[in-house]
Amino acid sequence: LSYSAFSRDGLIKQLEFEKFPEADAIYAVDHITVDWNEQAAKKAKDYLDTTSFSRDGLIKQLKFEKFTQAQAEYGVSKVGL
């Protein structure tokens, strides 16, 4: 999470992709301390570093990445959109 930003569900899917059993992935994600709002802000910044988005477009992209509506709105606001 220091290198790449993830939503909770996105991180679970990434761990499953890396061949961790679903139950283990869920357990791991539920037992770490993560500010999901800050992860959304980090992911929003990553997107804006490579392309341009409208506020609504970036919120939709973050929701596609499995951030909640509130997390997506926080992230987009944090980067100034």
Regions found by a protein language model. Give the residues of each.
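An alpha-helical, amphipathic repeat domain used for nucleic-acid recognition
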Residues: 1-81
